[in-house]
Amino acid sequence: MANLNIFGQEVGADVEGWTTRAFPEKVVLKGNTCRLEPLDRERHGSELFSAYSEAGQKLWTYLPAGPFTNLEEYLEFIKELNETKDTVPFAIINKETERAVGTLCLIRIDEANGSLEVGYVVFSPELQKTIIATEAQFLLMKYVFDDLQYRRYEWKCDSLNGPSRRAAMRLGFKYEGTFRQVVVYKGRTRDTQWFSIIDKEWLRIRKTFEEWLDKTNFENGKQKRGIAAIRESLSN
């Protein structure tokens, strides 16, 4: 049924009791295979630079920053991230090795409207396509929706970045559209694809991750059921 105002115009649904959401804090988020720590250049910089170096310059093709030719350049980048007003960066720690293997950041933080974006998703070769990679994403989502009670969680990428598009869809983000020629970076034009998860979708997505990450879903390190299959079963 349409929601009409006093002029008979159709308007959006009322948001009862809405209040401005809290700005994300520099917290530690703990999982079974990993934890997220506030990104610190002294604690994590050298480990991350070493881990990223294994992938070479191609790791930075679709990111506005990098590649970095030496550790000092990368440490300066971490410093800039931590000084950016609407950015909260995290390092992903492999609990088995206690080493930093990647980063995730909360960016474009809009407390008034309860919206933010996950960005600077930089996974080392060691982290890519692992259980840790998925659990790290889940830990950050849980913090955003369960602890901070945000309404909207965004993912954006270069339209030509196939791995990023596929990752977003696998994790449960919905494609919203493409902004054409929205950015010039590294001397190139960029069309940006937008994806999101909103609060009313979160319960099913959370249950999907919980079932996928359960130890009974793995045998000799191999998944028995994929995330897409679990999510589909929960929608029936």
Curated annotation (Swiss-Prot):
Report what the protein is called.
Answer: Uncharacterized protein YIR042C
Q: Which InterPro entries does this entry report, sorted A to Z? A: Acyl_CoA_acyltransferase, GNAT_dom, Ribosomal_N-acetyltransferase
GO terms of molecular function? protein N-terminal-serine acetyltransferase activity; protein-N-terminal-alanine acetyltransferase activity
Q: Name one Pfam family in it.
A: Acetyltransf_3
Record's PROSITE patterns? GNAT (PS51186)
UniProt lineage: Eukaryota, Fungi, Dikarya, Ascomycota, Saccharomycotina
Q: Which residues form the N-acetyltransferase domain?
A: 47-191
